[in-house]
Protein backbone atom coordinates (compact mmCIF):
# COMPACT_ATOMS: atom_id res chain seq x y z
CA UNK A 1 0.00 0.00 0.00
CA UNK A 2 1.14 3.51 -0.73
CA UNK A 3 2.48 5.47 2.22
CA UNK A 4 3.99 8.55 0.56
CA UNK A 5 3.64 10.61 -2.59
CA UNK A 6 7.37 10.17 -3.09
CA UNK A 7 6.84 6.40 -3.20
CA UNK A 8 4.08 6.75 -5.78
CA UNK A 9 6.14 9.03 -8.04
CA UNK A 10 9.24 6.84 -7.72
CA UNK A 11 7.31 3.67 -8.56
CA UNK A 12 5.54 5.38 -11.45
CA UNK A 13 8.86 6.47 -12.96
CA UNK A 14 10.61 3.17 -12.24
CA UNK A 15 7.87 1.07 -13.82
CA UNK A 16 7.03 3.66 -16.48
CA UNK A 17 3.34 3.48 -15.56
CA UNK A 18 0.81 6.17 -14.74
CA UNK A 19 -0.34 6.42 -11.12
CA UNK A 20 -3.80 5.24 -12.14
CA UNK A 21 -2.33 1.97 -13.40
CA UNK A 22 -0.38 1.45 -10.18
CA UNK A 23 -3.60 1.91 -8.23
CA UNK A 24 -5.49 -0.60 -10.39
CA UNK A 25 -2.71 -3.13 -9.87
CA UNK A 26 -2.76 -2.50 -6.13
CA UNK A 27 -6.53 -3.01 -5.96
CA UNK A 28 -6.20 -6.30 -7.85
CA UNK A 29 -3.50 -7.50 -5.46
CA UNK A 30 -5.16 -6.31 -2.24
CA UNK A 31 -8.63 -7.59 -3.04
CA UNK A 32 -7.82 -10.67 -5.10
CA UNK A 33 -10.14 -9.61 -7.91
CA UNK A 34 -9.81 -9.23 -11.66
CA UNK A 35 -8.94 -6.04 -13.48
CA UNK A 36 -12.40 -6.11 -14.99
CA UNK A 37 -14.00 -6.18 -11.53
CA UNK A 38 -11.89 -3.23 -10.34
CA UNK A 39 -12.71 -1.18 -13.44
CA UNK A 40 -16.40 -2.08 -13.25
CA UNK A 41 -16.66 -0.90 -9.65
CA UNK A 42 -14.88 2.37 -10.39
CA UNK A 43 -17.13 2.95 -13.40
CA UNK A 44 -20.14 2.48 -11.14
CA UNK A 45 -18.67 4.98 -8.67
CA UNK A 46 -18.13 7.49 -11.47
CA UNK A 47 -21.69 7.04 -12.68
CA UNK A 48 -23.08 7.56 -9.18
CA UNK A 49 -20.97 10.72 -8.83
CA UNK A 50 -22.10 12.22 -12.12
CA UNK A 51 -25.75 11.30 -11.52
CA UNK A 52 -25.60 13.05 -8.14
CA UNK A 53 -24.15 16.15 -9.81
CA UNK A 54 -26.91 16.21 -12.42
CA UNK A 55 -29.63 15.60 -9.84
CA UNK A 56 -28.28 18.34 -7.61
CA UNK A 57 -27.93 20.83 -10.45
CA UNK A 58 -31.57 20.19 -11.33
CA UNK A 59 -32.46 21.34 -7.81
CA UNK A 60 -33.04 19.14 -4.78
CA UNK A 61 -34.03 19.99 -1.22
CA UNK A 62 -33.29 18.21 2.02
CA UNK A 63 -36.14 16.28 3.63
CA UNK A 64 -36.50 19.08 6.19
CA UNK A 65 -36.51 21.73 3.48
CA UNK A 66 -33.77 23.63 5.29
CA UNK A 67 -31.14 23.16 2.60
CA UNK A 68 -31.04 22.67 -1.12
CA UNK A 69 -31.40 24.50 -4.38
CA UNK A 70 -28.12 26.39 -4.03
CA UNK A 71 -26.35 24.43 -6.76
CA UNK A 72 -29.16 25.16 -9.19
CA UNK A 73 -29.11 28.87 -8.27
CA UNK A 74 -25.34 29.00 -8.69
CA UNK A 75 -25.62 27.30 -12.09
CA UNK A 76 -28.22 29.87 -13.15
CA UNK A 77 -25.86 32.65 -12.05
CA UNK A 78 -22.99 31.07 -14.00
CA UNK A 79 -25.21 30.86 -17.07
CA UNK A 80 -26.09 34.57 -16.74
CA UNK A 81 -22.50 35.46 -17.67
CA UNK A 82 -22.20 37.98 -14.82
CA UNK A 83 -19.45 36.19 -12.88
CA UNK A 84 -16.13 37.99 -12.67
CA UNK A 85 -14.30 34.69 -12.13
CA UNK A 86 -15.60 32.99 -15.25
CA UNK A 87 -17.46 29.73 -15.41
CA UNK A 88 -14.77 27.04 -15.17
CA UNK A 89 -14.06 27.27 -11.45
CA UNK A 90 -17.67 27.97 -10.52
CA UNK A 91 -18.89 24.95 -12.51
CA UNK A 92 -16.77 22.78 -10.23
CA UNK A 93 -18.11 24.54 -7.14
CA UNK A 94 -21.70 24.14 -8.34
CA UNK A 95 -21.14 20.43 -8.98
CA UNK A 96 -19.60 19.96 -5.53
CA UNK A 97 -22.52 21.75 -3.89
CA UNK A 98 -24.94 19.70 -6.00
CA UNK A 99 -23.47 16.46 -4.70
CA UNK A 100 -23.68 17.62 -1.11
CA UNK A 101 -27.29 18.69 -1.62
CA UNK A 102 -28.14 15.24 -2.97
CA UNK A 103 -26.49 13.81 0.14
CA UNK A 104 -28.57 16.13 2.37
CA UNK A 105 -31.73 14.99 0.57
CA UNK A 106 -30.81 11.36 1.35
CA UNK A 107 -30.02 10.68 -2.29
CA UNK A 108 -27.36 8.34 -3.64
CA UNK A 109 -23.79 9.66 -3.60
CA UNK A 110 -20.33 8.13 -3.66
CA UNK A 111 -18.91 9.10 -0.25
CA UNK A 112 -15.31 9.60 -1.29
CA UNK A 113 -13.49 9.98 1.00
CA UNK A 114 -16.36 10.91 3.34
CA UNK A 115 -19.97 11.99 2.88
CA UNK A 116 -19.10 15.50 4.05
CA UNK A 117 -16.50 16.00 1.33
CA UNK A 118 -18.21 13.85 -1.28
CA UNK A 119 -18.67 16.74 -3.69
CA UNK A 120 -15.01 17.63 -4.14
CA UNK A 121 -13.95 14.88 -6.54
CA UNK A 122 -17.13 14.90 -8.67
CA UNK A 123 -16.97 18.70 -8.73
CA UNK A 124 -13.44 18.65 -10.11
CA UNK A 125 -14.18 15.95 -12.66
CA UNK A 126 -17.42 17.61 -13.77
CA UNK A 127 -15.68 20.96 -14.30
CA UNK A 128 -12.82 19.38 -16.26
CA UNK A 129 -15.29 17.35 -18.32
CA UNK A 130 -17.17 20.52 -19.24
CA UNK A 131 -14.02 22.51 -20.02
CA UNK A 132 -11.99 19.89 -21.87
CA UNK A 133 -14.61 17.32 -22.93
CA UNK A 134 -12.64 14.50 -21.28
CA UNK A 135 -13.82 11.00 -22.02
CA UNK A 136 -14.93 8.39 -19.51
CA UNK A 137 -11.60 6.54 -19.62
CA UNK A 138 -9.76 9.70 -18.58
CA UNK A 139 -12.28 10.36 -15.81
CA UNK A 140 -11.74 6.83 -14.49
CA UNK A 141 -7.97 7.34 -14.53
CA UNK A 142 -8.51 10.49 -12.49
CA UNK A 143 -10.49 8.53 -9.91
CA UNK A 144 -7.84 5.82 -9.64
CA UNK A 145 -5.14 8.47 -9.25
CA UNK A 146 -7.15 10.20 -6.53
CA UNK A 147 -7.54 6.81 -4.85
CA UNK A 148 -3.78 6.35 -4.76
CA UNK A 149 -3.37 9.72 -3.09
CA UNK A 150 -6.13 8.74 -0.68
CA UNK A 151 -4.11 5.71 0.35
CA UNK A 152 -1.24 7.99 1.33
CA UNK A 153 -3.56 9.99 3.58
CA UNK A 154 -5.12 6.85 5.06
CA UNK A 155 -1.74 5.28 5.75
CA UNK A 156 -0.41 8.31 7.58
For the regions a language model picked out, list residue spans one by one.
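Conserved phosphate/anionic-ligand binding catalytic regions in large, soluble enzymes, centered on
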Residues: 106-124
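Generic N-terminal targeting/processing segments that precede catalytic cores or assembly contacts
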Residues: 1-107, 131
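Beta-strand segments within the central parallel beta-sheet cores of soluble alpha/beta enzyme folds
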Residues: 135-148
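A structural-propensity feature for long, helix-poor, extended segments
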Residues: 147-156
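Alpha-helical support elements that line or immediately flank enzyme active sites
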Residues: 122-134
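Alpha-helix capping and helix-loop boundary segments enriched in small/acidic/polar residues
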Residues: 83, 112-115, 137
Amino acid sequence: MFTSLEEIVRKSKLENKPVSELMIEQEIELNGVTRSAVEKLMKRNLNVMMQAVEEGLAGVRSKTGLTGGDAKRLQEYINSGKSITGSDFLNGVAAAIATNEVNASLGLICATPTAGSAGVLPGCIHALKQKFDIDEETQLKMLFTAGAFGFVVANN
